[in-house]
UniProtKB/Swiss-Prot annotation:
Its EC number is 6.3.2.8. This is UDP-N-acetylmuramate--L-alanine ligase. It is found in: Cytoplasm. The gene is murC. One of its GO terms (cellular component) is cytoplasm. Keywords: ATP-binding, Cell cycle, Cell division, Cell shape, Cell wall biogenesis/degradation, Cytoplasm, Ligase, Nucleotide-binding, Peptidoglycan synthesis. One of its GO terms (biological process) is cell wall organization. It comes from Polaromonas naphthalenivorans (strain CJ2). The keyword Methyltransferase does not apply. It catalyses: UDP-N-acetyl-alpha-D-muramate + L-alanine + ATP = UDP-N-acetyl-alpha-D-muramoyl-L-alanine + ADP + phosphate + H(+).
């Protein structure tokens, strides 16, 4: 007899991927609980939905639980994992639970080293505007929905497919997007780029024969795997051979304007697009969404409206507005999750296009010692060539042990030797808000970048300066 699963407990509930799955299951009627090491806005929001949350991991948190879901950050010696094993409660990896969710709808999976979250969000937004009411699970907060997941009534589920731990190989989509393939999370693949490429091929081969692969052929590695595909392919990019192609691309403030040519199958009329995102990399992300829309016959007007009204994703080129600088002027703070050299370069280039002639101040917290080691020279090259001033924090370890010559000070020294910028090393991330306030000048664009605790910095800068403004005003009124 099939065991009825009613209560599902998530270990690491505060993570973007975990919280989204939990919320969808909660809306499906399951009893959901979960724990995380520290409290967060995500936990508080889920608690507000009626999900039982715990701060800290303890065996006592598992009460009448039928299944446990773990993220890759949760180790086998976690007390809740040990308690579940002792009680013979199934312990399920996050990706397997996501795969179970996808079985009930037609899955659209977005994979790639860079741009997954934004592309997933754009696809979900286009489908929603087209009246398809998709379910979605995204690795970031979709601003228009106020959440990173939603249970829709339509036939489709749009998910972000994670290659970092090879867990995307558990998914069985009917449509898959690959934005690019780059060297990251190489420890998962035995530091062999061939293994990484093969994983993407295997991921695409998991689709049924009637599935569609939507591939960015601007990416050289994606082009290399095209001959290995047996399913139908739609290519997209800026290159002349792409079936869904952008031409006449131009930056207009913090937006991108372009014309989309659509030649996958029957040639469709050119589509003029106003994308409410900055950067050429986001034009590619939008083309992926347009390619999906063509496959699903989403009306052109809905595609145009979804892209022009797109309000972004949390921690992706997220503006905190203009703030008072010490010299009497104003500066702008923008946060971005980018933490790989390719992402840093794309985001800073987007900032150049959106704010021409402005000084770019990069406040950067490297993420993981292993990535800092593997991409060290690329970080030096990208930061030196794209930023006008640099505030550099120590590496966010993400559970890793420090690696000699792959720390923040070593990166600062290398940038100094390169000679294009004079970095300021900020020993503690807690001191970064003050360092930003001290460095910012009138007209500056301060880019806070990284996947770690630097995400808390912009709000602290805003709070500091608002407090100072209140004190000044009170002094003037006294």
């Amino acid at each position: 007899m099939k065991h009825a699963i009613k209560h599902i407990h998530f270990i690491g509930l505060g993570g973007a991927g975990m919280s989204g799955i939990a919320e969808v299951l909660h809306n499906l009627g399951y009893v959901i609980s979960g724990s995380d090491l520290s409290d967060s806005a995500t936990l508080q929001r889920l608690a507000g939905l009626g999900i039982q949350t715990f701060v800290g991991h303890a065996a006592a948190n598992l009460v009448d639980v039928d299944a446990v879901v773990t993220s890759t950050a949760v180790h086998a010696d976690n007390p809740e994992v040990l308690a579940a094993r002792e009680k013979h409660i199934p312990v399920v990896p996050r990706a397997l639970m996501l795969a179970e969710l996808m079985r009930f709808k037609q899955g659209i999976a977005i994979a790639g080293t860079h741009g997954k979250t934004t592309t997933t969000s754009l696809v979900a937004s286009v489908l929603a505007e087209g009246g398809l009411d998709p379910t979605f699970v995204i690795g970031g907060r979709l601003n228009s929905a106020g959440a990173n997941a939603k249970l829709g009534s339509g036939d489709y589920i749009v998910v972000e497919a994670d290659e970092s731990d090879a867990s995307f190989l558990n998914l069985l989509p009917v449509m898959a997007v690959v934005t690019n393939i780059d060297a990251d999370h190489m420890e998962t693949y035995g530091h062999d780029f061939g293994n990484l490429k093969k994983a993407f091929v295997d991921f695409l081969r998991r689709m049924p024969f009637y599935g569609t692969a939507i591939l960015c052929t601007d990416d050289p590695v994606v082009r290399q795997i095209v001959p290995e595909m047996s399913c139908p392919i739609t290519s997209y990019g800026l290159n002349e051979e792409a079936q869904v192609r952008a031409i006449n691309v131009r930056a207009v403030g913090a937006q991108m304007h372009f014309t989309a040519q659509r030649r996958n199958g029957v040639k469709l009329p050119d589509l003029d697009v106003v994308l409410n995102l900055a950067g050429q990399h986001n034009v590619l992300n939008a083309l992926a969404a347009i390619a999906v829309a063509v496959e699903l016959n989403v009306p052109d007007a809905a595609v145009q409206k979804a892209l022009s009204d797109f309000t972004g994703v949390g921690r992706r080129f997220q503006s905190y507005g203009e703030l008072p600088a010490r010299d009497g002027g104003r500066f702008t703070v923008i946060e971005d999750y980018g933490h790989h050299p390719v992402e840093v370069a794309a985001t800073l280039s987007a900032a150049r296009g959106a704010f021409p002639g402005r000084r770019l101040v990069l406040a950067f917290q490297p993420h993981r010692y292993s990535r800092t080691r593997d991409c060290f020279e690329d970080f030096v090259k990208v930061i030196s060539s794209h930023a006008d001033a640099v505030l550099l924090a120590e590496v966010y370890a993400a559970g890793e042990t420090p690696i000699v010559a792959a720390d923040g000070r070593s990166l600062a020294r290398a940038l100094r030797v390169a000679g294009k910028v004079e970095p300021v090393f900020v020993d503690s991330i807690h001191d970064m808000p003050q360092a930003i306030v001290d460095a910012a000048q009138d007209g500056d664009i301060v880019m806070c970048m990284g996947a770690g605790s630097i995400g808390l910095v912009p709000a602290k800068v805003v709070a500091m300066l608002q407090f100072q403004e209140v004190n000044v005003l009170e002094g003037q009124c006294a």
